[in-house]
Amino acid sequence: MTNRIMNKQTIITALLALLAMTGQGQTSFDPNGGCLNVVDFSFGQGIGEYGNNCVSANYLHEVFINEQFCIGGGIGYSHHKEYKFSAIPVYFSTHYFFLDNRFSPFANLRVGGFALFNAKNVGTNEKYSISKEKQGFSLYISPSIGIKMHITPNIGVLASVCDEAYLVNAFDNSRNDYRSKLIHSLGVNIGVCFQIKGW
């Protein structure tokens, strides 16, 4: 009986400590607390005729303009299942947090270019094949909407729905030739955001 009471007290104490910890989460970002750093992972399903399944990881570093808006840049890695290639996107990024609260919906836009490598389905003249010729400008664009939640004053989590699009020279079945195509994947993005003063 005594052990059961002690176990209940331990659980209640742990829950109260957790509640106190989460209750200290700030209601907004502090522009003087350092830049916004984000590490995230996304898993997407192909959409559209030329879409493909994509897995990616990214790091973003953004400067706060105010508590709700920040701009900066990022770099990532992605693997494309159907097209059988990998890419390293480098891009401009911006976040806008709609509310000055601990929980806030946000919008994120990433625009830049990418380096394509490790391509295996090249010049086969079939769907999901990419051209042997060197690509020109390689556009990368990824809009997303989601929600942010602070866990501590300097750490939070982000969850969003994103559309990752890459411009590639893909085989067009209807024209029997390679054409510039935006290949899309619609997915879920999960990340951690943090601020380190002076960084």
Locations of regions flagged by a protein language model:
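Bacterial Sec-dependent N-terminal signal peptides
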Residues: 1-31, 35, 196-199
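Short glycine/proline-enriched turn or capping motifs at secondary-structure junctions
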Residues: 8, 179-190
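Outer-membrane beta-barrel domain signature
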Residues: 30, 45-50, 79-83, 130-135, ...
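Polar/charged side chains located within well-ordered beta-strands of beta-rich proteins
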Residues: 37-39, 59-61, 163, 184
